[in-house]
Regions:
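Active-site proximal helix-loop segment of RNase H-like, two-metal nucleases, encompassing DDE(D)
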Residues: 123-131, 142-164, 178-186
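Extended, charge-rich low-complexity interaction segments
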Residues: 157-171, 297-308
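Retroviral integrase
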Residues: 1-149, 196-342
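Active-site-proximal acidic segments at structured loop/helix or strand boundaries
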Residues: 164-213
């Protein structure tokens, strides 16, 4: 029996049994688990200054934001560089703050957004502050660098050398969301995280920490044809926990490449066949690596840091600085020009 247990740990559950014997289970009850933030804390910091920028990971665009008070970060996927798409992404962020009782008073951004922000100013009554030519918003540039570092670190943990567009999009969103899960240095509270301040659900180990991003899973595939030979599970790549209250999972179907949501999954060790399937999907979309690009979708190679942006402040805010981080060349990489050079 010990040999069988060892084999199960190495090879995981029997996939044929999962595909043939899995049955539907009773859904989990809906339980609201949101920490109540003192109203005085929200009232005191109600007016927010927001810094925004655009970043590309391969061909996938994101509007990145960070505020100067709560330090909440977001990366909203955009499908094009049109003003309508920028407006849609910004509306997602503003609704999040407004829903928690905060008001965006000023938006700091590069001149690229000037035409768009005239509409935002009129519709949403937000004050705009545009940088001078060749200048940048320091908080936005540091935020891009921080998100980029987290994406690159997470990518290095994956067994895949290339990932498709869907996985890139969720990788950026997941890494950005994780930066909001714990109290930040320079924020408004040493006890409440940015996510808690905006009324997002609390971190639950059983819901949010069971399966890592990029894992190979068998997702329960419910069908009304119970007497047929239709498979009971689907091959999928794990993306992130679902955002609903009862729990669930957002996945990439390995057969179609589309995002699906399932209530229950079973993690299976990643095999060479799975790795080849993911990399083939990425190669078909023209992705062979992970590259960070500017708003013109041009790859920026390592160069000097952007003038006027104090990257030491980013280290102070994101993590406790140690001597190795500052003295041994954390900045020798000189990545910021990989981001939007606006």
């Amino acid at each position: 029996s010990e040999d069988i247990n060892i084999a199960e740990k190495i090879f995981g559950p029997d996939m044929s049994s999962l595909k043939g014997k899995s049955t539907r289970r009773k859904p989990n009850p809906v339980k609201e688990d949101i920490i109540e933030v003192p109203k005085e804390l929200i009232t005191q910091h109600r007016e927010i200054d927001l810094c925004i920028d655009i970043m590309y990971v391969n061909e996938c665009g994101f509007m990145t934001t960070i505020d100067r008070t709560i330090k909440f970060r977001s990366a909203i996927p955009i499908t094009s560089r049109t003003h309508e798409e920028y407006y849609r992404a910004l509306d997602v962020v503003l609704r999040l703050y407004n829903g928690a009782g905060f008001v965006i008073k000023t938006i700091h951004c590069d001149g690229e957004f000037r035409a768009l922000m005239e509409r935002v100013k009129d519709d949403l009554h937000v004050k705009m502050n545009f940088t001078n030519a060749l200048d940048h918003v320091p908080e936005a540039e540091r935020n891009n660098r921080t998100i980029k570092e987290r994406i690159r670190a997470a990518f290095q943990r994956l067994p895949y050398k290339a990932i498709p567009r869907v996985m890139i999009r969720y990788l950026a969103m997941t890494q950005t969301q994780q930066l909001n899960l714990f109290p930040v240095k320079g924020g408004v509270s040493p006890y409440f995280s940015p996510a808690t301040m905006l009324g997002l659900p609390s971190l639950d180990y059983n819901k949010h920490c069971q399966v890592p991003y990029g894992a190979f899973v068998q997702a329960n595939h419910e069908t009304n044809q119970t007497s047929s030979n239709v498979t009971r599970t689907l091959d999928a790549i794990y993306l992130r926990p679902a955002t609903n209250m009862q729990g669930g999972h957002e996945l990439m179907d390995l057969n179609s490449g589309h995002v699906i949501t399932r209530a229950r999954v079973t993690q299976i060790p990643v095999t060479e066949i799975v790795i080849r399937a993911v990399e083939t999907m990425a190669h078909q979309q023209g992705f062979k690596d992970l590259k960070f690009k500017n708003r013109h979708k041009q790859v920026f190679h390592d160069a000097d840091w952007i003038a006027g942006v104090d990257y030491a402040d980013a280290a102070d805010e994101d993590e406790e600085e140690d001597e190795a981080y500052t003295d041994n060349g954390a900045g020798d990489d000189n990545d910021d020009d990989d981001m939007d050079d606006q």
